[in-house]
Amino acid sequence: MNKKRLASVATSLVISSSALGAELSLLSNLEIEGDARVRGISTSGITSNSDKAKETYDSRIRINLNTTTDSGVKIHSRVVLDNDTWGKTSDKNVEWDEASVLVPLKDFFVYAGRVNDTYGTPFYGSHNDKIDLAFIGYTGIENTLLYGFDYKAVEGAYNSSNGQLGSSTGDGDYDAYGLGGQITIDKLLLGGRYVSLQDNRSDDGGKTFRDTKGFFVDAFASGEIAGLELQAQIQQNGGDKYSGGKKVDLEALGMYLNVAKQFDRLKIGAIAISTEDGYVAGGDLEASYLTSPTNGAIATLGRVGGYGDTVLLSGQVKYDINPELLIEATIASHSIKKATLNSLNKDLEITEYNLGLQYKIAKDVTYKIQYAAASFDQGNLDDIQNAMHSINIKF
């Protein structure tokens, strides 16, 4: 099975070698790689953070360490050094971001550790949030992966959970158990899974536990079909959850379609997104600059669905002027029901325009400039103006 396909399952897997309870020979190889970024951002108008002009610089270095033992066990670790806002000392962080191990067996593999939850496409709500995972995969059928897993969002007194599985409060346990599979047909990857959510956290020091059970069903497609690049994903949540001090129905539905076509140096694409009943898309979803923190827009409009049930439609064009220079443009329409942005609580229409440029200074060095503007159909909201430039280095 193509090892690159395993990455789409959900994960990059990581635990420290000492946690394996055995000595491992790490003499086979040790690879160190990573990336560094310095960027400046200027924002004016209403944003998810404030309604005044803001100029910031930040920097980030990510270092990956990978090794393979003589017996084929793969160990991965990543350290992130963040200086989120220059001049603000409280935003300086050093984090052991990932730590995982992949143990190959005949027709099986075991994958375990602290990983980024990257199931399917970037639309998945917890995309790149941290989970602690134990994952068993079966690869005995050609071009097919079957798997089962258990992951923790909250364990014991550790109360840092991700956005998909709940707020970062409460002590106790929050577990997810699931079964899934995926198959590669020509150039198209198709996958699906069922996940059971069990929330047994306590907000009052152990006097009362939530004892709620929910689930979600997820399916995705990613790859190429009929000459088109395709990403599609749908997730339906059910069962119950804990909100406002009581059990309530867990109902959320998210749908995503991204289609693109390459014409020599020109690429044209279209994206359609729908979120209902509280579904919030992943943070790495690049539907527009103002909904994608990875594009450097300070999450100005936050994740798609974060301000209310949303329908987002966008058209994108990218053109390679030469091997070093790329330009791109996007126009996006956001329709949000009872939008909570700036405590509005009204239906809101947003029209967004994006323009970007990427220039490859050297083989591993890229300079980016991005500009975004957004206008609202509500007169009491100031239009957004957002500009970002950055240096990105791979090593």
Give short role names for the model-derived ranges:
Residues 2-117, 134-144, 183-188, 192, ...:
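Beta-barrel outer-membrane channel/assembly domains of diderm bacteria
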Residues 146-225:
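Internal metal/ion-chelating core segments
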Residues 141-142, 153-170, 199-201, 207-210, ...:
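Gram-negative and organellar
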Residues 198-199, 237-239, 274-278, 334-335:
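Short, catalytically relevant binding-site loops at active-site mouths
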Residues 120-122, 155-158, 200-202, 241-242, ...:
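Extracytoplasmic/secreted cell-surface and envelope-processing proteins
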Residues 247-291:
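Long, well-ordered mid-to-C-terminal structural blocks that present hydrophobic/aromatic surfaces
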